[in-house]
Amino acid sequence: MQAYQRDFIRFAIDRGVLRFGEFTLKSGRTSPYFFNAGLFNSGSALAQLGRFYAAAIVESGIPFDVLFGPAYKGIPLAAATAVALAEHHQRDLPWCFNRKEAKAHGEGGSLVGAPLTGDVLIIDDVITAGTAIREVMQIIESQDGAKAAGVLIALNRQERGNGELSAIQEVERDFGIPVVSIVSLTQVLQFLADDPALKQHLPAVEAYRAQYGI
């Protein structure tokens, strides 16, 4: 586990974004942990989050020309990541996002920010069913000269969907692009094992992974 990954897990726990207990997911599964990126909801938290995304981009080595933040949750994530890349990695890259509803006046269209062209790195919080990413792929494919380079998310739950694959594996298979994450469940388990105060949650998370993991 990289230092930034350990720091991210601690940061997510401290902010209440990553919690342990008993939670019912939209899928109906009862999960021993819950991740809610919407709780990175202050200026300092967003700045720090952007630095973690930027670190994961550098670590991934994925080449790209523009960052794309899917509406709505991906918008502040892409903005914060673009700032962090410029300030901490001397990589001043363009970014853009989509509107849910196209505007008939002003700029017009459904895209805002830099032109969506070249290799596009999509920034989002998690991939649950893959539906949102499939919508984003349609947007990218509709732009001349644009193609998806990959997807970066905060947490990979490493969890099967209805079939044998996870939603992330299905996206990778269907679109031929890498999906990378700041951390995955593997690192969360490692963090729990190393933390005396949180180790009590390890058996439940391990059991959940044994049942639903990939």
Swiss-Prot record:
Highest taxon listed in the record's lineage: Bacteria
UniProt-annotated binding residues for 5-phospho-alpha-D-ribose 1-diphosphate: 26, 72-73, 99-100, 103, 105, 124-132
Record bears the keyword Electron transport: no
Biological processes per GO annotation: 'de novo' pyrimidine nucleobase biosynthetic process; 'de novo' UMP biosynthetic process; pyrimidine ribonucleoside biosynthetic process
Cellular component aspect of the GO annotation: cytoplasm
Coiled-coil intervals: none
Listed name of the protein: Orotate phosphoribosyltransferase
Organism for this UniProt entry: Pseudomonas fluorescens (strain ATCC BAA-477 / NRRL B-23932 / Pf-5)
